Curated annotation (Swiss-Prot):
One of its GO terms (molecular function) is poly(A) binding. It comes from Emericella nidulans (strain FGSC A4 / ATCC 38163 / CBS 112.46 / NRRL 194 / M139). The keyword ATP-binding does not apply. Residues 1-26, 357-413, 706-732 are annotated as: Disordered. This is Polyadenylate-binding protein, cytoplasmic and nuclear.
Length: 732
């Protein structure tokens, strides 16, 4: 391959080699000498990758050609799932050319990769010059076979066969040539040829925008009409005579099944659009043999599906807007609250259009009647076998009719799920109900009342909160390693000797953090993210550090990593507090840390009470101070605390309950639940069933997130594991 190859525009990355714009008439104006536009670093686009392919796998493959500058697998910003393509940068352009020649269509994880030059200029990427469209391809033809077929007509920049989600060919593909002359030559020689015994069509690629405008023009000048609700007795000749009066007919046919019977619909194609339009206007809704006909423009299947999809979306949006701000979600209901009781509770606040308590679908009480019905049916069958067939059959039919009539009236009610919905006639009434009924005690339980949300909206909010915390962990890790955020945002793999870092290692030759090790986190006002940064020589807390007053209430499980035995969690913090000269009292740090640094678990002490700083001025850190009272967290106690302290108090109360059922993920789940309102969290503390339901919902979201994240490089996992517990559980 010549050096001139890299100067040509490549297709847009997001179209995977299928640019949308129409082809340019000539290519001579774009071509330039290789010496003027040749980049110093050769960048390759690698597509058609399996989602599990990582930077390390690509480095192992592409480093066999030459020295790799960097590799980046592009991932979704939220889920971090691979988008199926990557960029490989060489320092030497010759290495890029060699990789393009030797590694194109190489199997990676069982899938052939597709390599082409990367073109950052979107204007050059989307010119569409030299792009050829091929359809009616045999399913056995893949990217490599298509490339080998069309390579004889010129230099190919990109070649792709369209596939569905299962990797099966859709029967069409694209070949992007370097020049328009090569594309014209391929169209001239291959169009109409047989490939694997199938005649293929080859032509210039037309952009979607141009195709859409052409399609709209065809719709406005239609000649083919569709007729349905035709009587099955109507014959072809009679069907044709119905429409002959409107103009010249080129074809008219009735659709029939395999036995030759009419299926009740047909098509008529006129020679002019005016004739077809007149037939639609006059024959639509006209009765023929006592059946009202439907006559309209003939549509393709994909067009009908698109219209149905738009109608469904419009109906869904209309329904969502109709109930926006008027539908309330009510939970923490007792089992004795039914639909009527729920309507009675919310009736004073406005006109209620519907009120429903959600219940289990399979009540236990119905098991006995069903078994009795089966036994009686068996007895009737036995009697029928003895000669009482007709009376038994009549009685059985009567009983079935009675049961069918009674079912709508006596629908069995299952056990209440503890929540329901109330829909008002106006948003003002709904807002008033939320204000008055939220946290109101009903049958000894505080209600939670809020505007109802769809399940997908709630799930997206949880996923967004998970992603936000993941970004915070990355930023904290970058700050701890002495790097800016720009190094952590894109996951880039750098080759040996290149600028940057290898995943799992940090700058300055530091080893990656191991699970159980405590990492320094950047301090922010009102937060205590990790070991106190800014402390030097054990001189106590720096002047700009702020520690929540009730920090001593953090559970030990949230502070101790899997690699640290009980009683030895974070000795560095002890040293910073116990040694050196203390600079006055730290608010809320007096006395032993209950469940935190002050004492270990399992009978292993952490050294008891913190020793005061020797030679320090003012009150020592280890002297007794005010503590948060031990007991059940109440709404009054929560409201009395400062706003920045309320979440931590809730986290301290939630963590032991969650740890009892999910000890490994207690910190993560607690952090996820703390995104909820404080009033709702208070309800969870009092209702174990509701708490379990929320924990299960958070687990399902977290499991799905981890599945999507399972394709990340293995080298990054130890580093991430070391950061997960401190970042998530300190927040609790």
């Amino acid at each position: 391959m010549s050096a001139e190859t890299s100067t040509t525009p490549a297709p847009a990355e997001n179209t995977n080699g299928t640019p949308d714009n129409a082809p340019a008439p000539e290519v001579t104006a774009v071509e330039a000498p290789a010496t003027t536009s040749q980049p110093h670093s050769a960048s390759l686009y690698v597509g058609e990758l399996d989602p599990s392919v990582t930077e390390a796998m690509l480095y192992e493959l592409f480093s066999s050609i030459g020295q790799v500058a960097s590799i980046r697998v592009c991932r979704d910003a939220v889920t971090r799932r691979s988008l199926g393509y990557a960029y490989v940068n060489y320092n030497d352009t010759a290495h890029g050319e060699r990789a393009l020649d030797e590694l194109n269509y190489t199997l990676i994880k069982g899938k052939p990769c597709r390599i082409m030059w990367s073109q950052r200029d979107p204007a050059l990427r989307k010119t569409g010059q030299g792009n050829v469209f091929i359809k009616n391809l045999d399913s056995a033809i893949d990217n490599k076979a298509l490339h080998d077929t069309f390579a004889a007509f010129g230099n190919i920049l990109s070649c792709k066969v369209a596939q569905d989600e299962f990797g099966v060919s859709k029967g069409y593909g694209f070949v992007h040539y370097e020049t328009a002359e090569a594309a014209n030559n391929a169209i001239k020689h291959v169009n109409g040829m047989l490939l694997n015994d199938k005649k293929v069509f080859v032509g210039h690629h037309i952009s979607k925008k141009d195709r859409q405008s052409k399609f709209e023009e065809m719709k406005a000048n239609f000649t083919n009409i569709y007729i349905k609700n035709i009587d099955p007795e109507v014959e072809d000749e009679e069907f044709r005579k119905l429409f002959e009066k409107f103009g010249e007919i080129t074809s008219a046919t009735l659709s029939r099944d395999s036995e030759g019977k009419s299926r009740g619909f047909g098509f008529v194609n006129f020679s002019t659009h005016e004739s077809a339009q007149a037939a639609v206007e006059e024959m639509n809704d006209k009765e023929v043999r006592s059946q009202k006909l439907y006559v309209g423009r003939a549509q393709k299947k994909h067009e009908r599906e698109e219209e149905l999809r738009k109608q469904y979306e419009a109906a869904r949006m209309e329904k969502a807007s109709k109930y926006q701000g008027v539908n309330l979600y009510v939970k923490n209901l007792t089992d004795d609250v039914d639909d009527d009781k729920l309507r009675e509770l919310f009736g004073p606040y406005g006109t209620i259009t519907s009120a429903k308590v959600m219940r289990d679908t399979a009540p236990v009480e119905t098991a006995t009647p069903e078994s009795e019905t089966k036994e009686s049916a068996n007895k009737e069958n036995e009697k029928a076998a003895e000669g009482e067939k007709e009376p038994a059959a009549e009685e059985k039919e009567k009983e079935e009719k009675k049961e069918a009539e009674q079912k709508p009236e006596k629908k069995p009610l299952g056990k209440s799920k503890g929540f329901g919905f109330v829909c008002f006639s106006s948003p003002d009434e709904a807002s008033k109900a939320v204000t008055e009924m939220n946290q109101r005690m009903v049958n000894g339980k505080p209600l939670y009342v809020a505007l109802a949300q769809r399940k997908d909206v709630r799930r997206s909010q949880l996923e967004a909160s998970i992603q936000a915390r993941n970004n915070i962990r990355q930023q904290q890790a970058a700050a701890a390693a002495g790097m800016g955020q720009a190094y952590m945002a894109p996951a880039v793999f750098y080759g040996p000797g290149q600028q940057g870092f290898i995943p799992g290692a940090q700058r300055g030759g530091m080893f990656p953090p191991q699970p159980g090790m405590m990492m320094g986190m950047p301090g922010r006002p009102g937060q205590y993210p990790g070991p106190f940064p800014g402390q030097q020589g054990g001189r106590g807390v720096g002047p700009n550090q702020q520690i929540p007053p009730n920090f001593q209430g953090l559970p030990m499980g949230a502070m101790q990593g899997p690699g640290i035995p009980n009683g030895m969690g974070y000795p560095m913090v002890q040293g910073q507090f116990g040694g050196g000269r203390g600079r006055g009292q730290v608010p809320g740090m007096g006395g032993p840390m209950r469940g935190g640094y002050g004492g270990g678990r399992g009978g292993v002490p952490l050294g008891g009470q913190m020793r005061p700083g020797q030679g320090g001025r003012g009150q020592a850190v280890g002297q007794p101070g005010p503590e948060t009272p031990v007991g059940v967290l109440t709404a009054q106690a929560l409201s009395a605390a400062p706003p920045q302290q309320q979440k931590q108090m809730l986290g301290e109360a939630l963590y032991p309950k969650i740890q009892a059922t999910q000890p490994e993920l207690a910190g993560k789940i607690t952090g996820m639940l703390l995104e909820m309102d404080n009033t709702e969290l208070l309800g969870l503390l009092e209702d174990d069933e509701a708490l379990r339901a929320k924990v299960d919902e958070a687990l399902s979201v977290y499991d799905e997130y981890m599945k999507n994240k399972s394709d990340e490089p293995a080298a990054e996992k130890p580093k991430e594991a070391a950061q997960e517990a401190p970042a998530e559980e300190n927040k609790a």
